[in-house]
A protein has these predicted regions:
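C-terminal motif of bacterial Sec signal peptides marking the signal peptidase cleavage site
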Residues: 20-24
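Domain-terminus/edge residues, biased toward the C-terminal soluble/receptor-binding domains
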Residues: 26-28, 195-196, 209-212, 216-217, ...
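Alpha-helical transmembrane segments of integral membrane proteins
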Residues: 9-10, 153, 232
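Bacterial N-terminal signal peptides that target proteins for export
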Residues: 2-12
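Hydrophobic alpha-helical transmembrane segments of integral membrane proteins
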Residues: 11-14, 106, 273
Length: 329
């Protein structure tokens, strides 16, 4: 695939920041996250959300939630942030703290998938080096190893369907040569989409104080990702079986989608169909979920997001609440 080209992004960001500084506008400079505070250290990531119409790639049909806009929260959602957008009408139906900076956990892999699909051929042989090793306990992996012969497509299914953090690293190093170079691509693409309150340092979403996003930025990123048919195909896959070589052996893993709406563990409310989505969890991020759904009555499509729910049960209960609200639209 032809690689995307960027160049004027940082200059544009600095110009916008200067404009807002002169006019006296203020952005949120930090967000409390489980006792941590994320400060605005990187200039181009902090253009006000109300300036999104000036960012490259910002479309007129996107729902706009300006910084400081009031919540429609009715107390039913206890998660730190939530957002429900009718993407057919470009209308925000429900929002709670849409611009609060939070850890995204594996919802990061939405952007990882988008960048990979836009910049690489899925059939190419993936690059697996020592960077695949993750020095953390209790990290979900596909158990790829140095020397395995896999394609980028297999790694991407491993990253999105199985949420394997090692698979996400393979995607990054295959597409960009290194994790840091891929993170640069992620940040540039996010900025193009108007996701200016986010910053990414890795392709998997494991906790780092400099790796964060907002519910609204995730909406912008996911809204772009679902325009890619291959992304929707991967993110809607219930179960994926593949095979690859490891020395003289053939490895045949089967991965099941952890999204309980996709794998059938949780039923969507009456009148709603869940199409695809991405889960996320770390201790710092809490339970996270991004969903594309459709009303069986009106045909309207919705993006719904929950960030930092306190438990898996609460995550799915609160997401079901958003989907039920969508069914009434």
């Amino acid at each position: 695939m032809k690689k995307r080209k960027t160049g004027f992004l940082r200059a544009l960001a600095l110009m916008l920041i200067a404009m807002f500084t002169l006019s006296g506008c203020k952005d949120e400079t930090s967000a409390a996250m489980n006792g941590l505070s994320i400060e605005n250290n990187i200039a181009y990531d902090y253009v006000l959300s109300s300036s999104l119409s000036t960012a490259k790639g910002f479309a007129a049909d996107l729902a706009v939630s300006e910084s400081g806009s009031s919540n429609t929260d009715d107390g039913a959602v206890s998660a730190s942030a939530a957002l429900l957008v009718d993407i057919t009408d470009g209308k925000i139906v429900y929002q709670k703290n849409p611009h609060l900076k939070l850890y995204p956990a594996s919802t990061t892999k939405i952007l990882t998938g988008l960048v990979a699909l836009e910049n690489a051929d899925l059939s190419q042989v993936a690059a697996i080096d020592e960077s695949i090793r993750i020095d953390e306990d209790n990290v979900w992996i596909c158990d790829f190893r140095v020397g395995d012969v896999v394609t980028l497509e297999q790694a991407l299914y491993g990253a999105i369907v199985n949420s394997g953090n090692d698979a996400a690293i393979i995607v990054a190093t295959t597409v960009a040569g290194s994790i840091s170079s891929f993170a640069d691509m992620m940040n540039e693409r996010a900025f193009e989409l108007g996701a200016t309150n986010s910053h990414f340092v890795n392709p998997h979403g494991l906790t780092n104080e400099q790796h964060y996003t907002t519910a609204y930025d995730l909406y912008l990123i996911f809204n772009e990702a679902i325009k890619n048919a291959e992304f929707v195909k991967i993110a809607s896959t219930v179960k994926y079986t593949t095979s690859f070589t490891r020395g003289k052996y053939t490895i045949v893993p089967t991965w099941t989608n952890g999204n309980q709406f996709i794998n059938g563990s949780v039923a969507a409310p009456n009148g709603m169909s869940v199409i695809c989505g991405k889960t996320g969890y770390t201790e710092a991020a809490g339970y996270c979920l991004v969903i594309l759904s459709e009303s069986q009555t009106t045909g309207h499509r919705f993006i719904s997001i929950i960030l930092n729910a306190q438990s898996r049960d609460k995550l799915y209960n609160q997401m079901s609440y958003l989907l039920e609200k969508a069914s009434y639209q």
